[in-house]
Each structure stands twice: as C-alpha cells, then as structure tokens.
C-alpha cells in the first residue's frame, strides 16, 4: 500500500478553496506563492498518480501575477481534458490523433475561470469518458492517492486524484454516467452532479437526443461546492430552474428519505449494504424520516437502454473521428471499450429509437417517486473500489460486465436530469473511502447541499493526511 499526498507547510497548507480565497484576499498569502506551491505539489505527486494530461504552469504563473476578479481569485485548479481551454490541446483521454490547440475557451471554461481560479493545466480521464476507471494501455492508469494500487475512478480521474491528494482544493469535473460522483466516492470527496441545465455545456453536447452530460466540480468540503454554485449562478443562471442561492449551513426541514441498496441489476456488496444502512441510521438520529425501499424507480430495461445509448455516443466518436479531430485520427489506436461500444451500437441500431424514447420518459417515473420522498439514498457504487487492472479495457465484454455491475446506481440521474451528490461518509475494511449518494428532485441542489452540510458536521470525513 502506498498513500500519496502533497499536503504540507506551504502557501496552500490544508486549506479548502473558500479558506484559500479568503487568505488571498486578506493578504496572508500571495497569488504567486499559492500557484507556485500548487505547481510544486503537482510535480511531487503526479509521477505516482498519473493525473496530469497537459501542464500549463507558465501560463498559470503569468495569470497569477495579475489581479484577478471573482470569489476564487488566485485559487489553483485544473480543468478536465474533455473541454476546450484556449491555447491548449483537448485529447479526451485518447492518443488516437495528433491534437490541435483550441482557439477559444469552451462555454463552461469561460464560466469556471470567471469565478476566479487559475488553471494549472488539464487532468486525465478515461478515453472519451466511457469507462469508470482511467486505465489507458499506452497513457497509463490514474491511481488513487489513498492507495495507488486502486483506481481513482472515472471519468474525472485526474481531477479526483489531485483534489484528494491536496494538489489543488477544487477541480473541474463532468458527469455523463457518474463521472463526478464515482471519483468522489473513490477518493473521499464531495461530488455534486447538478440538474440538467444548471451549468452551460458546449454546443455539441446540447444537441444530444438525451442530455446526459453536465459540468461541475470536485472538492474536499461541502462549503467549497456550495460556494462554487453560488458564484457560478451570479454569472450564469438558467431561468427555468429554481436558484441554488447561498447555502451555508444545514437546513431545518426534516426530510422524507428513501433508502435503496439494490439496483435493477443486483444488490450491492454486503459491506456497502451495511455502510449504506449505517448512513441511514445516522439520518434517523438526525430526525429525518427514513424508509427502506426495495428498488429504485427504474424499469428493468433501463441498463440495456442506457448501454445502447452509451454505444451511440461511442459510435459518434469513432465514425466522425477524422471530421472532429483531423486527418491524423487513427481508430486502430482506440481502446477496446470504445470500439466495443461502437460495435454494440452498430449491431443494435434498430433498437435505438425505442430505447431513446424510453430514456426520455424515465423522468415521469422519478417525478412520481419524488412526490412521495424528498431524497433517495443509495451507495454511489455497488462494490468497493477496485484495484488497477480490474477495469483495464482489454477484453470488451469482460470489462463491460464489470463496469455495469459497479456503476449500477449513477446513470439514472444523468438520464432524468436530477441532481445527486456523493459524500464520503464511510470507509471500507481496507481503508478506502466509500461514497453515499443522495438524489433529490429536479432543481433541488439547495436541498442536497443543506443535507450535505448537516452530514459533514455530524460525521466529518476521513482525511488522507491523517495517519501517515
């Protein structure tokens, strides 16, 4: 077992993003010293973790020398390498083409940087974000800082590893099937998947027949996540959604909470079942009304429909690769998971229209569920965090069977558009973090953040730097 972190007695200390932003504003630390400390931390842990996709250290130094605006002004961060940053390549976790530098920032990049943080570069992900573990055959795996024998989860792998290891207090992530929440669970972080439409998307994602992808952040504290959504909302607000507002403390309302430990496919592992029920007992102690429910509000054909839609997204990358990425695109360099998903879609294209129709209708079923309950509690994933190698994309069918079993709970909210947050409320017997996922009705991020503040106060998370 090797635990890797960068926490130390430098300008970053062990501050979260809000604390660091406050320290910069008060003049206790300078932007330049903070950015330099984050660069040193990156260089110290990246050889062990493999989370860095592209470094922009010199650009970060130059940016730090300017008096920036925004609440998080001067706070170091990273951006996941599947959205554009002007002047930097976007490789999407693949080496199947020679990258070109982006001409402009993507829509979310502009919003994120407008809140003030300084990006040190881009973080690694699984190829196109399709796998829940970044284990590229040539680029190498992204390892978990709690124990480098284990995966950091995916697809926001590098962001999760770097935030957990103390390189930066907050990093960009996005989620099309669990890619914020799964790394949050694996790395002991707070990971909120917002409601569909809460934050801007680049144009190609807005045109999808089912809008499953959302942007967000990974943090170590609830207040960092809450502060980000408050600041983002001041810059960009969707008038069709209720505002998140300035959530700073637990809510007073006692909630009706349904607890589910079984997905459509299977019961979660015995250990995760017990940890979930332990979290349910904590909720009862806090005065919430908790009820065991046999299964989530999901039809039995949901996993097959989601997998087919996943395959469609892979086919779009494979079949339009030269158009999207240039003439250097070489599909023979794609990993077996991407190619296997493409084949799955091609063989079952006749089923796709009805699958999309059923996915679009799923929100009706969950709306009925949330007419009875305020919140749904499940484990974030169905099994303990796997070791590196378990999800390596060598044999398509084997890795797909393993993936679908492990990520059985997270895709639902991508299809329905509802918000869900993973909180590091537990640890497995081997000492790895375990996330509990809380889902609320569409647009109810504020309710989830209030509950998260309450749980963080009642059961503070384990800290990676304690017990070295």
UniProtKB/Swiss-Prot annotation:
InterPro entries: Amidase, Amidase_CS, Amidase_dom, AS_sf. One of its GO terms (molecular function) is amidase activity. The keyword RNA-binding does not apply. Keywords: Hydrolase. It comes from the Bacteria. It catalyses: a monocarboxylic acid amide + H2O = a monocarboxylate + NH4(+). The active site is at 80 (charge relay system), 155 (charge relay system), 179 (acyl-ester intermediate). Its EC number is 3.5.1.4. Belongs to the amidase family. NCBIfam families: PRK07869.1 (NF005899). This is Putative amidase AmiC. The gene is amiC.
